[in-house]
Amino acid sequence: LRNQLTGRRNIEVGLLAQGLNRAAVEDLLPAVVEFTGLGDAIDMRMETYSSGMRARLHFAVATATSPEILLIDEALAVGDRSFREKSAQRLDEHRANAGTVLLVSHNLSEIRRSCDRVIWLQDGLIVADGQTDEVLASYEAS
């Protein structure tokens, strides 16, 4: 996404980059704008956004379609409780549709709720790789 563009225009560009045609973008745009929860700020340039506002916009665009692989990096750590809850629900929908979600998070409850498999990285090295409960038990014991 581009800082010099408005949030709305970034949504359009982001959806076009995901392979949607202009008509599909027009149809999807209102729902994506609403999901961001940015209100009137959606028509401001992204360079004026806080980091949380940027994260909301990025997450909304990335999850507006059904990619085969979705990478989410700490996105559920931003925003108010309502946004975090609807973001978690959106991730659940992607997982239910057999999509692969790679979630980067330090939030153990989020990991427990969202992940079937966990890879614990520390200092760039894999410490553990396996079922969520097993890896988190090792992590918590360390």
How would you name each of these model-derived features?
Residues R84-N97:
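Helical segment within the ABC ATPase nucleotide-binding domain
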Residues D129-G130:
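ABC ATPase "signature
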Residues S105-H106:
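H-loop/switch region of ABC-family ATPase nucleotide-binding domains
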Residues I111-R113:
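A short, surface-exposed alpha-helical micro-motif characterized by mixed small hydrophobic
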Residues L5-L16:
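Q-loop/switch helix immediately C-terminal to the Walker
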Residues R22, E26, V32-T48:
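Conserved ABC nucleotide-binding domain
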Residues A64-I72:
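A short, proline-enriched helix->beta-strand linker immediately N-terminal to the Walker B motif
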